[in-house]
UniProtKB/Swiss-Prot annotation:
Family matches, as PANTHER family: FE(2+)-TRAFFICKING PROTEIN-RELATED
InterPro entries in UniProt: Fe_traffick_prot_YggX, Fe_traffick_prot_YggX_sf
Keyword Iron: yes
Assembly with partners or alone: Monomer.
One BP annotation, GO: cellular response to oxidative stress
Protein's name according to its UniProt entry: Probable Fe(2+)-trafficking protein
C-alpha cells in the first residue's frame, strides 16, 4: 500500500517513497517531503548532470556537488543548469 504525502516540490498530495532512498537527516526529509514523481524528476536531472559534467561517484567533491544540486532542485525550487542543453519545448 502506498503512502500519501504533501510533496514540497510539487506542492500537492502525491505518492510518497516506499522507503528512505538517501542516508541521514537529508534522507529522512526526502522520505517525508518528496514524492515518487518528484524523485523521478530529480533522477533525470541527476543523470544529465553526471553525464554532462563527467562526474564520478567515487569523488567526494562530485558527490557533494550532486547533493547541493539535489537540495536546490527539490527544496529551493532552483532548476539544474546544464550548459549547452536546451529543453525540447524551447528549441
Amino acid at each position: 500500500m502506498s503512502r500519501t504525502i504533501f510533496c514540497t516540490f510539487l506542492q500537492r498530495e502525491a505518492d510518497g517513497q516506499d522507503f528512505q532512498l538517501y542516508p541521514g537527516e537529508l534522507g529522512k526529509r526526502i522520505y517525508n517531503e518528496i514524492s515518487k514523481e518528484a524523485w523521478a524528476q530529480w533522477q533525470h536531472k541527476q543523470t544529465m548532470l553526471i553525464n554532462e559534467k563527467k562526474l564520478s561517484m567515487m569523488s567526494p567533491e562530485h558527490r557533494k556537488l550532486l547533493e547541493q544540486e539535489m537540495v536546490q532542485f527539490l527544496f529551493e525550487g532552483k532548476d539544474v543548469h546544464i550548459e549547452g542543453y536546451t529543453p525540447p519545448e524551447k528549441q
